């Protein structure tokens, strides 16, 4: 039974960008993720869905080592990042280096108390880019990729807080894109936005899939169906089902997945 119309017009890729092997994650003594195996495909959008507290955001934050900020958290298993086959969860891998390769956009817009230009240039400066001409080129390119350039090109010196909520979120996306990440993580990026701004962000995500691999956490199943190529359904820290979005939404293999998607459970 077809409940939602999945995204169309984009070719599914089976080129692996990342492989998750037997991933377990613990908040102190509490196990939040249980033995997860999953593929992440290159230049595709993968949506993570499931009820509140199922582990979606916890899983997402493993990819850029956000959990390292709290000392009692710990991982087991691997997240392999191609093409160099590096296990990014290894203690020998610097989490700062991981975050240079894997950027994140959060639930609520979080611009820095700086100008529009300096918000986007911030990560570039940290990475050692100093020449003004290069900064200007990279900032413009990031703002164009975030579909924001035409709206802000004449006021790059204005404070980012003067932008609307939707513009601030696109600015955060531009900031994440400026350092050319290999993977872009979205944690419910439209939950704090109105329907018009939400539609703009969804269109942007669809456009970005041609440039970068994307993982998105969303509680909105219609959104997952609209923007994603692959979908993972999670429940109580376990990955219940993973596959092409059209398969998950039209003909899921697992009864629990079907019950969640059709609203009988969740």
From Swiss-Prot:
It catalyses: phosphate(out) + ATP + H2O = ADP + 2 phosphate(in) + H(+). Belongs to the ABC transporter superfamily. Phosphate importer (TC 3.A.1.7) family. Residues 15-261 form the ABC transporter domain. It is a peripheral membrane protein. This is Phosphate import ATP-binding protein PstB. One of its GO terms (cellular component) is plasma membrane. Disulfide bonds: none annotated. ATP binds at residues 50-57. It comes from Nitrosomonas europaea (strain ATCC 19718 / CIP 103999 / KCTC 2705 / NBRC 14298). Pfam families: ABC_tran. Keywords: ATP-binding, Cell inner membrane, Cell membrane, Membrane, Nucleotide-binding, Phosphate transport, Translocase, Transport. Its EC number is 7.3.2.1. The complex is composed of two ATP-binding proteins (PstB), two transmembrane proteins (PstC and PstA) and a solute-binding protein (PstS). PANTHER family: ABC TRANSPORTER I FAMILY MEMBER 17. It is an enzyme of class 7 (translocase). One of its GO terms (biological process) is phosphate ion transmembrane transport. The gene is pstB.
């Amino acid at each position: 039974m077809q409940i939602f119309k999945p995204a169309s017009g984009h070719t599914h890729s089976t080129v692996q960008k990342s492989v998750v092997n037997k991933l377990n994650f613990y908040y102190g003594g509490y196990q939040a993720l249980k033995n997860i195996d999953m593929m992440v495909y290159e230049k595709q959008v993968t949506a993570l869905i499931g009820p509140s507290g199922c582990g979606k955001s916890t899983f997402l934050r493993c990819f850029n080592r956000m959990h390292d900020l709290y000392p009692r958290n710990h991982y087991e298993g691997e997240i392999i990042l191609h093409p160099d086959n590096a296990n990014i969860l290894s203690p020998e891998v610097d989490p700062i280096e991981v975050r240079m390769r894997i950027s994140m956009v959060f639930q609520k817009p979080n611009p820095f108390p700086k100008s529009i230009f300096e918000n986007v240039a911030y990560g570039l400066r940290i990475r050692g880019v100093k020449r003004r001409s290069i900064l200007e080129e990279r900032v413009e390119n990031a703002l164009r990729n975030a579909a924001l350039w035409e709206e802000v090109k004449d006021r790059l010196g204005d404070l980012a807080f003067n932008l609307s909520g939707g513009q601030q979120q696109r600015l955060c996306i531009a900031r994440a894109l400026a350092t050319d990440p290999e993977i872009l993580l979205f944690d419910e990026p439209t939950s704090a936005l109105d329907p018009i701004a939400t539609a703009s962000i969804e269109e942007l995500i669809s456009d970005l899939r041609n440039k970068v691999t994307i993982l998105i956490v969303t509680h909105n199943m219609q959104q997952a169906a609209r923007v994603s190529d692959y979908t993972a359904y999670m429940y109580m820290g376990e990955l219940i089902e993973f596959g092409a979005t059209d398969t998950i939404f039209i003909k899921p293999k697992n009864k629990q997945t079907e019950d969640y998607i059709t609203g009988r459970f969740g």
